[in-house]
Amino acid sequence: MRKILLTSFVTLSLFHITACHHDSDEQPMAQSTAQSKTATPPIAQVDSHKESLQWLNQAAQDRADIYAPFELNADLSSLSVRQKSMLKLLIEAAEITDQLFWEQSYGEKNALMQKLSTEQQRNFANLNYGPWDRLNGDKPLFTSIGEKPLGAQFYPADMTKEEFEKLNLPDKKGLYSLIRRDGSGQLRLVPYHIAYQSQLSRISDLLKQASALADDPEFAQFLNLRAEALMTDDFQPSDFAWMKMKSNPVELVIGPIETYEDQLFGYRAAYESYVLIKDLSWSKRLEKYASFLPELQKGLPVTDAYKPPMSGTGSDLNAYDVIYYAGHSNAGSKTIAINLPNDEEVQLKMGTRRLQLKNAMKAKFDKILIPIAEQLISPQQLKHVKFYAFFANTMFHEVAHGLGIKNTLAGNSSVRQALKENASAFEEGKADILGLYMVTELFKKGELEEGELMDYYTTFLAGIFRSVRFGASSAHGKANMLRFNYFKERNAFSRNESDGTYSVNFEKFQQAMTELSHDLLTIQGDGDYQKAKEWLETKGVIDSGLQQDLSKLDKANIPVDVYFKQGVDVLGL
């Protein structure tokens, strides 16, 4: 998935099963001798000798209540006693990935928490996994806090882009290693399985214990393979095993998966986990859509070179209730759908799995999207904002990650490597717009039968306003703004100056969708780094007019996103 984040229509969210966001003593890079020799000091850490941190200003403090609480629960009555015991082990393993993500995103958590004097400060820092506001351009929240490093904790604080580009090390762009300085100041790689050896060993043990309790033999095999993968950083065998699973009622996503946290290059993956319960009845309703992927790939509005033969036929769609988020998936905006694995080789051979997170999705629709639509969608079109359209738009965003092109036409790199730090935003933008393209085509074929096409377009526009509130700093935020401004330039929607509400212009909206699909796929296929960078710099921004409209949502006290009450106690385990 790329984490749709939980953004655009996901968050989002979005995510490698090659490794799609609780607390314990954090001591980054202290797990092994090899690690301690190469570790650099944590970036932007708090000096324990300084006075307590205060809110940077009133505006920062006012944002402490932008998240609405939501209890993560699910019907576990069909699970055996063994499976319920297994769930507890999976949640315990997920909690450790939460610790790992703190190390990757910020550094020593306890040092920060000890300098925050109020529960409100600590809670908000916890939601952001650090002292920066993830849904407001990563702005500092507290006094004495500098700008968030683009490379988080993946790179040395003093490393420049130029220094990295000149670095002659194999796999320097790899997903599963840290860049550190050795004793002589030279850059070197430290694999995750060495850097985080202690925590990963514990996770591996927990997964092996859980496998012994699994009723489904394929799930048991996956847990064992994933346990091994975490200790070697070789995730492909477990990815294949994950794709082979079809009947398991319990699902787990765990490991270093998405690269959004690395805003310097977009190379390095961050740890996260999801523990999920499959909704078998809803999943059955979704089965048929996967079979249309090859046909939809052929119909993409670009020349054949930009739409190579469809990836593997093993792709599937399923609906789930999430019972636990941890690490990257729990930071800031919450993902509502996932598309995994990210490994292109696995995708080509077996396709991907699209996980629709039904309970989280319904929470965002009821608590956030409907109130937003009531403020910003014209009264005449408000009737078109529907949950089935929100569900479909979100679902096909994830499906659309599998469409398009993975490697540049020149054949010398992947799209991700060619577009560098712009790759994630373009991938999310592609998934958003191709998802809507798929909705349009399937509706025309009569395969989507609920409502009318205007429902999906109007709900899509309302969803942009929801996701834009996540800010324009994340990959999803930039993708949202690029699309909003592209559509605005083409009069795909109109703004009523008298009341500040928006209306979809149906035909122009559909035309803009087709043109943007073509343009994004072309930039990806060409590996055009400069154009991608230019687009995001000029179109991936929130202008003053839109900002004024979004301020109406703040005045109406509409939550920006949700946070979860979760864990074994909530589940009654």
Q: Which role fits each region the language model picked out?
A:
Residues H16-A19:
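C-terminal motif of bacterial Sec signal peptides marking the signal peptidase cleavage site
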Residues P42-F222:
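N-terminal helix-rich structural modules
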Residues D216, S424-E441:
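An active-site-proximal "capping" alpha-helix that borders the catalytic cofactor pocket
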Residues H21-S24:
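Bacterial signal peptide processing site
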Residues I405-G429:
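Post-HEXXH active-site segment of zinc metalloproteases
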Residues L436-E534:
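Long, well-structured alpha-helical subdomains associated
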Residues Y192-L382, K386:
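Contiguous, non-catalytic segments that form substrate-binding/exosite surfaces or channel walls
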Residues S80, A392-K406, A431, L436:
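Active-site recognition of the HExxH zinc-binding catalytic motif
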